[in-house]
């Protein structure tokens, strides 16, 4: 059986809906399945960037399988229109019965784009930085905690500095792979604004300046900045 999901059916009349269903029913399902299969086999071959192991052991077979499945996974995470990259695939559209990772955290996406580069998915990496990051950067240079992959701001519960720092790091890591100076120039203004924000943010945390910005009040509620230097060096990744 084939089940059809009718999306936004309130925007078409019933007759038009049935015409669409009839057109779908006329399609050769086996031919469509074969076409899809050929597409993804070709896709995997195009992105294999290592010499796969000879499958003479269970370990090697498993290694090759995981590698190929990883290639198939990444397109499911990526929004082709915006370049946004979700942290994980979610099947629960309401995000109530799941891990709630179907969002784009800039920090997480940066590390995923590093995997993109290792799989010859450089275009996907560049779209993330050139389109998604540019469109979601705040006026003060920061990136918020998380977004929907279409670029809309998602619910947040607190600022995490590595969301911003990670993007600057990721831009340079991608440049080291491609050596594309034009990409670096395109990213320069965005990264300069991000670094300026990071300097202000850290000055506030360390108590080096009294000038307040949009995150200072939140920082002061969390940290005793005057005793900051006396605290042991211990932090979680998202507090970097």
Predicted segments with their positions:
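Generic secondary-structure boundary/loop-capping signal
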Residues: 82, 140, 144, 158, ...
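Extended hydrophobic/Leu-rich segments
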Residues: 2-7, 17, 162, 215, ...
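C-terminal ends of transmembrane alpha-helices
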Residues: 77, 81-82, 200-211, 223-231
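Active-site-adjacent structural elements in folded domains
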Residues: 87, 91-100, 150-155, 213-218, ...
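Aromatic-rich carbohydrate-recognition surfaces in CAZymes
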Residues: 25, 32, 36, 101-208, ...
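Acidic/polar, glycine-enriched structural segments that form the non-catalytic walls/loops
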Residues: 1-100, 181-183
């Amino acid at each position: 059986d084939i089940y059809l999901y009718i999306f936004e059916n309130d925007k078409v009349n019933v007759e038009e809906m049935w015409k669409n269903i009839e057109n779908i029913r006329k399609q050769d399902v086996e031919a469509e399945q074969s076409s899809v299969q050929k597409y993804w086999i070709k896709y995997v071959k195009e992105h294999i960037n290592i010499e796969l192991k000879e499958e003479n052991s269970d370990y090697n077979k498993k290694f090759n399988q995981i590698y190929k499945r990883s290639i198939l996974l990444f397109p499911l995470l990526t929004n082709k229109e915006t370049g946004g990259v979700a942290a994980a695939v979610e099947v629960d559209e309401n995000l109530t019965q799941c891990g709630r990772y179907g969002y784009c955290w800039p920090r997480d996406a940066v590390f995923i784009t590093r995997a993109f580069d290792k799989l010859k998915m450089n275009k996907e990496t560049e779209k993330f930085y050139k389109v998604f990051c540019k469109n979601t950067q705040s006026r003060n240079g920061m990136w918020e905690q998380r977004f929907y992959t279409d670029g809309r701001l998602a619910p947040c519960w607190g600022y995490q500095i590595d969301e911003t720092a990670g993007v600057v790091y990721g831009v340079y890591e991608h440049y080291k792979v491609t050596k594309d100076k034009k990409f670096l120039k395109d990213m320069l203004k965005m990264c300069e604004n991000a670094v300026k924000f990071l300097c202000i943010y850290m000055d506030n945390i360390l108590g080096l300046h009294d000038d307040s910005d949009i995150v200072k009040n939140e920082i002061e509620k969390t940290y005793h900045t005057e005793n900051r230097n006396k605290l042991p060096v211990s932090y979680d990744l998202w507090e970097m």
